[in-house]
Amino acid sequence: MRASQFIIEALDSDAVNELDLYIMNNEDLYRRRFMPIITNIRRKIKRNIYDHNKVIKMWMYLVDDAAREYVKEFGSKDQDVKDVFPKETRLQVAQVIADRELENIKQGEYDAPKGTVS
């Protein structure tokens, strides 16, 4: 491998981590996109129709919204989402979130105790 390939991979890794952190720390995205996806996934698991490959598409709606908001908040006026976060990077973020949140759901992270208001 060439040195430039290592640099590109490191940059992509940083972009993936940056966008993932932005998503996990944005209250509006959490309420508007994240929790409805979690609810949908829990419903699909309960009905035994969960398909991990199809769930990536659901997470992409969240990731695309987050990428647009990130560029709007931190980017310059001439930057485009596709330049800052290419589709491969956004897909990788969706995959990371899908894997992590499936594990969290299986561990009962989003199960509300009986008698609580959610």
Model feature map: region roles:
Residues R2-S118:
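Acidic interaction surfaces
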